[in-house]
C-alpha cells in the first residue's frame, strides 16, 4: 500500500478483449496521471488501435519496485483464444475473470492501492458456463 509520501498504484483491468476496454486503455500513455497505472492485459490487445502499436509496445513491463509518477506499465496476462474487435468469444471468459482475480489478489495483498475495471460482457461469460451477474457481485464474493 502507498503512504502519503508515495504514489498510489492502480491496477486497471482491460475487460472484455473484444470490447472497448483495450481501446480506452490505449489512450492512457502520454496523459498526465497522478498515479501509477498497471494495465492488466494481453499486450497484443493494446496495440490493436490503429497507429498505437508502436507506442503501446514501448510500455514497460510491470515492475513492482517502480514508483514513477504517471508511469503506465503492462502486466501481461495471456488471452485464452485469439481475439478480434467486436467479436465475442466465450473462450476468453476465463481471461476476463483472470484479470479481475489478479487485480483483486494484488489489492488484497497490498501490491495495488486500487483497481479500476473496464467493461466486461456478462452474457459471454455466462455463455462460457460461468455464472456472472457483474463486477460488483464478483468482487464482493472474492473479497468475502
Stretches with model-predicted labels:
Residues 1-143:
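Contiguous, glycine/small-aliphatic-enriched amphipathic segments in soluble metabolic enzymes
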Amino acid at each position: 500500500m502507498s503512504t502519503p509520501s508515495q504514489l498510489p498504484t492502480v491496477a486497471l483491468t482491460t475487460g472484455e478483449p473484444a470490447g472497448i476496454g483495450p481501446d480506452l486503455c490505449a489512450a492512457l500513455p502520454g496523459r498526465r496521471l497522478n498515479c501509477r497505472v498497471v494495465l492488466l492485459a494481453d499486450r497484443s490487445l493494446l496495440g490493436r488501435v490503429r497507429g498505437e502499436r508502436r507506442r503501446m509496445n514501448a510500455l514497460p513491463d510491470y515492475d513492482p519496485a517502480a514508483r514513477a509518477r504517471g508511469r503506465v506499465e503492462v502486466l501481461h496476462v495471456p488471452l485464452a483464444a485469439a481475439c478480434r474487435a467486436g467479436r465475442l468469444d466465450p473462450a476468453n471468459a476465463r481471461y476476463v475473470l483472470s484479470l479481475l482475480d489478479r487485480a483483486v489478489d494484488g489489492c488484497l495483498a497490498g501490491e495495488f492501492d486500487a483497481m479500476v475495471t473496464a467493461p466486461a460482457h456478462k452474457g459471454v461469460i455466462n455463455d462460457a458456463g460461468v455464472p456472472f451477474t457483474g463486477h460488483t457481485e464478483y468482487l464482493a464474493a472474492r473479497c468475502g
